[in-house]
């Protein structure tokens, strides 16, 4: 889930990348309007909706959103990076925004490796060989998986809440009671009542998750509504239910992803240069940094921000965190 941390993530991503160009900044382009001009491209099973801003020759940066958010999480940070010479790609994940499945016959599958392969397919479609990755929540997990399975495609990584790769076997194991409570929605989605409830109350549900994950963030209706529209995607509910049910071992994935999931079940190390970040007031379920530090075996740093930093704070903090 997105936050002040995610702004920090992008700033730190820059520090892992190449030296920034001032070309775009000097040109004085207004990249902010790009979020009103979403592009579409066929990539694998999907017709992907994505924002693509900044000079085409710039270092590619891929920013991945989480649930239940969307590309507008990066509506201010992406233009800031583009103005510094980066080519910034912000795709809508499957089940969000204008991204659509090309075939009606394709399962509305939300398993983690499928989402990671979507991003690799998008890179291929855009002829991007390697990119800097940053993400939070589903986006961080997706970026982690790309880094683990296709390290040659990842120049560097910034992951909010660190190492989020898991497996169905792990997901089946009970957690301490306090941890189980944080995952209440996952268990809700496992029931017919939860499926019906999320479909009926998607926006209200998302607003509740935003508030629980980010207790100090007083987001406006305008900010929420900009992202909530993406949840009206016709496949959003199915993909969401699939994702959380798959994690608990209640649904099988597609066979074409079996080899990826088998490798991920070994909890592979991530070897690319990485910075993980966390905040002191993150209301979303998240692992302790010490628990995953050893999974990053390349150049690695962890940054913990202050007690007032929660899991979703306004874009007003951008100026302090993008360098």
What is each PLM-predicted segment?
Residues 1-9:
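Bacterial N-terminal signal peptides that target proteins for export
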Residues 299-323:
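Catalytic active-site module of serine/aspartate enzymes centered on a nucleophile-bearing elbow/loop
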Residues 42-44, 65:
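Short strand-coil-strand connectors
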Residues 25-37, 45-48, 53, 60, ...:
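Flexible "cap/lid" subdomain of the alpha/beta-hydrolase fold that forms the substrate-access gate
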Residues 9-17:
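Bacterial N-terminal signal peptides
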